[in-house]
Structures are given as structure tokens and as C-alpha cells.
From Swiss-Prot:
Pfam families: C2, RBD-FIP. GO terms for molecular function: identical protein binding; protein homodimerization activity; protein kinase binding; small GTPase binding. This is Rab11 family-interacting protein 2. It is a peripheral membrane protein. A motif (NPF 2) lies at residues 406-408. Homooligomerizes in a Rab11-independent manner. Forms a heterooligomeric complex with RAB11FIP4. Interacts with AP2A1, MYO5B, RAB25 and REPS1. Interacts with RAB11A and RAB11B (activated GTP-bound form). Interacts with NPC1L1. Interacts (via NPF motifs) with EHD1 and EHD3. Interacts with TICAM2; this interaction directs RAB11FIP2 to the phagosome. Interacts with RAB14 and RAB25 (GTP-bound forms). Residues 178-188 have a biased composition (Polar residues). Residues 361-374 have a biased composition (Basic and acidic residues). Its main location: other. A Rab11 effector binding preferentially phosphatidylinositol 3,4,5-trisphosphate (PtdInsP3) and phosphatidic acid (PA) and acting in the regulation of the transport of vesicles from the endosomal recycling compartment (ERC) to the plasma membrane. Involved in insulin granule exocytosis. Also involved in receptor-mediated endocytosis and membrane trafficking of recycling endosomes, probably originating from clathrin-coated vesicles. Required in a complex with MYO5B and RAB11 for the transport of NPC1L1 to the plasma membrane. Also acts as a regulator of cell polarity. It comes from Homo sapiens (Human). It is found in: Cell projection, Phagocytic cup; Cell membrane; Recycling endosome membrane.
Amino acid sequence: MMLSEQAQKWFPTHVQVTVLQAKDLKPKGKSGTNDTYTIIQLGKEKYSTSVAEKTLEPVWKEEASFELPGLLIQGSPEKYILFLIVMHRSLVGLDKFLGQVAINLNDIFEDKQRRKTEWFRLESKQGKRIKNRGEIKVNIQFMRNNMTASMFDLSMKDKTRSPFAKLKDKMKGRKNDGTFSDTSSAIIPSTHMPDANSEFSSGEIQMKSKPKKPFLLGPQRLSSAHSMSDLSGSHMSSEKLKAGTIGQTHLLGHQLDSFGTVPESGSLKSPHRRTLSFDTSKMNQPDSIVDEGELCFGRQNDPFTNVTASLPQKFATLPRKKNPFEESSETWDSSMNLFSKPIEIRKENKREKREKVSLFERVTGKKDSRRSDKLNNGGSDSPCDLKSPNAFSENRQDYFDYESTNPFTAKFRASNIMPSSSFHMSPTSNEDLRKIPDSNPFDATAGYRSLTYEEVLQELVKHKELLRRKDTHIRELEDYIDNLLVRVMEETPSILRVPYEPSRKAGKFSNS
């Protein structure tokens, strides 16, 4: 037989036997009836149906599936005989024999019948007298399991291997393992070292690749796409990244280190810390540059030069870019009316003392360390310290200077102090401050509030494209299912029969 002709042949791998019913059985019971069951056997496998009690025409409709040990082809010398043995169950003693039938599966397959339902006559045992024992109705169907057919080919490939071939494979496997271990270090992410002229540390450069995260999304959501460098530098805050991108000096980076642990340690139970550090980072970028410029170029005439050194974090959001003397007359008068004459006298004295000490601070550099200490302890200071300063205490000296020289102090006291969860303070009316929505980290829209209009449009277009692709994929799956159902209906399986009666499985005998 040619290989092409053999490939076009259909060879079954399984046979499914369904015992439907029996009739005209010999009575063996006491009441003239039988408690009948049938044993189904092919080779060494045996199955048994349930017991149909007290009847001479039992109905079972139970099936059993057998795997053919070899290929069932035409002209095969190997014969496959299916045995059906009908028995009567006895409560006392051995079960009684009612009849048997032997079915040659080769003959059924050679007749090119994949399915056959037929009544078979029950016969006696060999050597016994032949008599009428009734009939049994059986359905025989040949099936092919592609998984079983492919397993034969795999087993044949494994048998052809010799011990020398296995030894050779082991040597190749060691060599492959060695090359894999040598190249496994390639998955470690590399970190680019900065140049000698660079003003930023390696930690800041690694943080540049970290994506922006909204400050209201919850505590530290790290995705699996982060590299090892991002995970190792996760303790660094976003304030240092923003300071590095603007181009500030090393001094500003050291000052902002005190705020680094605030957003990382913030949890859902205390969202105020996280919001505070985020807003102060947005504030400190332009203002710190102005303060450093004043220290370097020696602007002595401005009475508000050293105000930023004594500011706590809650007052740091006040605008200091504009000169307060250039404000409108109404705002200035309303703020100055709240100051008493002794305070004005002390303000002039402190201004003269500050001008005298400014040169000493520039030479010795003590102001820098003093400012860094204030920034480190600024988050824990409360606004109550500003309201009750002690003029005779050196630790409260800068606080008193700020209260006596800042014209916005009276205006800040007049307004309602907002909760620490929202520090976007600006010279606006109280109605605008009340309109600010409370930030809720559990809000689904909180992550989109920080996005611009263009970014929202990009997200919308991206989601529309994803929906379009999903609709196309769903349509393809529906077409595939329709075609598959048509092919199944053409085969007319038993599940599509009208009326459908689900078949029961016959019990299998144990080998013991």
C-alpha cells in the first residue's frame, strides 16, 4: 500500500459500545423474573452495566469505551472480539448465566460501517446445549482520538534511541546549561554611570526613568514592568527628580532630602503627609532658586531675603515672587492696620539687625546649616507656634521675624485654615478655597485629575482603539463558533438526537 493511500485511510483508535436493552430472556428468579446485568469485555478490559431488577426485558442504555491495542485495518491478522455476557444476580450463591454473544469488530469495520446498531442473538457456553436464550440490542461506534494517534509516533521515536545517543544528549545538555549560565547575566539591568562633569548623582539619573504616578492613587503601587534599578531606588521621592530636571545645585538636592521619605511612608490612614510633600515639592522648585540666587549675588536691600529660611511647610505655598510693596493700596492698608505701633518699631529693629548679620552669614556659611535644620523639622511644626512666638527665645527668632515682616500673615489668619490634605494656598478668596474638592485616594477619578486636556484625549483615543480591537476579535470568535457548530451538526452526534437521552456509563471491573 502506498504511503499516500495509507494517509487517506481512516483508522479508529477507540470503539464505543452501548448496551441498549434485551428481550426474551429465560427467567431465573424466584418470582419468574430476573435481576439482569451485562458484562462488556474487550481484551483484558471489562465493564458492567447496572442491575435491572425484576424484569425479563431490561433496558440499560449504558456505554463503555475501549481503546484498541493496535491498528484496525482491512486484512489485519489480529482479530478484535467483543464479548457481551448477560447475567442474573443471585442474592445467595453465584450469579446465573443467561447468555452471551461474541462480536467480531473486524467484520463490522470491513463493511465500512463506523456505527452499527443491531440485535444480537444470545448463545450458550461452549460445550453446552444450544437453546433460545433471547436477544440483546447493542450500538457499536468506531472513533478516532487524535491525541492517542500522535502518542504512538512519539513512543516509536523514543524506542530508537541508543545508550550512546543518550550520553551524547547529556553532554550537549551540559554544554547548553553552561552557555545559559554564562549568558544569564544579560538579564540584569545595566545602570548608566554619569559623567564627571554631571551635577546629579547616579540615584537621581536612575529616577528619571521612573514614570509619573498620581499622588492620590494609594500607597506605592509598583508594576511588574519596573526594572531592578527602579526598585532599588524606590525610597527616593519625586521631589528630588523634579529638582534634578530643573537644573538645581547640590545644595538644593541636600535640602530636599528631608522630604524624600514623606510620600513613601505615607499610607491610606494618613494621606495628609503624601499630599503635603507633593505640594511643597511643587512650591520649592522656583522659590528655592530665588533664595539661592539671593545668597550668591548678595541682595541686601530686600527685607524678605531670609524669610524662606524660617517658613514651615504649611506657609511655604504663599507667593513670594512678587514684591509685597507693589500690591494694591487696599490690600496693603488692610494688612498694615492689624499691626500695632510696637510691632512696627520692633520690625525696624529686626530689619537693621538682619542687614548687619547678613555679611557674617555669607562668610561663615552658618545660615545654610540653619536652613537645612529648619527644613528637616518644618513638617512637624504646627501653625500654633507662629501665633504665639517668644521674642526672648533664640529658637523662635525666625518665626517672630516672619510674623513681623510678612504682610500676608494677617490675611492668612483671616481665612479659614484648610485641612492638611489640601495645601494649595494662594491669594484667593475664601469661596475659592471652599470649592476645592476633598481628595479621596479611593476615588476612581483621582488618577485623572492631574492629567492635562491633551493627555485625557490621548487616553480616550487609546481606549477606543482597544475597544475596536476587542469587537473585531469577538466577531472572529463568533464566526469560528458558528462554523464549528455547522460541522458538528453535519456529523449528527447523539447529543443532537430528538429526544435526547443522556447515556449512562457502565462500571469498570478492577484488574484484581
